[in-house]
Amino acid sequence: MERTQRKVRMGKVVSDKMDKTVVVAVEMKVRHPLYHRTITQTKKFKAHDENNEAKTGDTVVIMETRPLSKDKRWRLIEITERAVAL
């Protein structure tokens, strides 16, 4: 039996305060059904970060996975861009 294709999203880390968990904000462009204008929607996902590698401001890739807790259904795949430290 083959495994189905899992969803992959790219977003920005907005919180890394939890242990082994990051909150990733993903922006999606959708068209309004009535006014046909492009709207930017932001959705936040809690993702599993096993080694606590990602920091706030990093751009990351997350992939859908089995439920890991009440809210976590995504896991960190890679950090594509590090945030600039001030």
Curated annotation (Swiss-Prot):
Give the CC-aspect GO terms: cytosolic small ribosomal subunit
From the UniProt record, give one GO term of the biological process aspect: translation
SUPFAM superfamilies to which the protein is assigned, alphabetical: Nucleic acid-binding proteins (SSF50249)
Sorted alphabetically, which Pfam families does this protein's record hold?
Answer: Ribosomal_S17
Determine the domain of life of the protein's source.
Answer: Bacteria
Kindly list the GO molecular function terms attached to this UniProt entry: rRNA binding; structural constituent of ribosome
Question: Keywords assigned by UniProt?
Answer: Ribonucleoprotein, Ribosomal protein, RNA-binding, rRNA-binding
Q: Which family does it belong to?
A: Belongs to the universal ribosomal protein uS17 family.
Role summary = One of the primary rRNA binding proteins, it binds specifically to the 5'-end of 16S ribosomal RNA.
Subunit comment: Part of the 30S ribosomal subunit.
Name of the protein: Small ribosomal subunit protein uS17
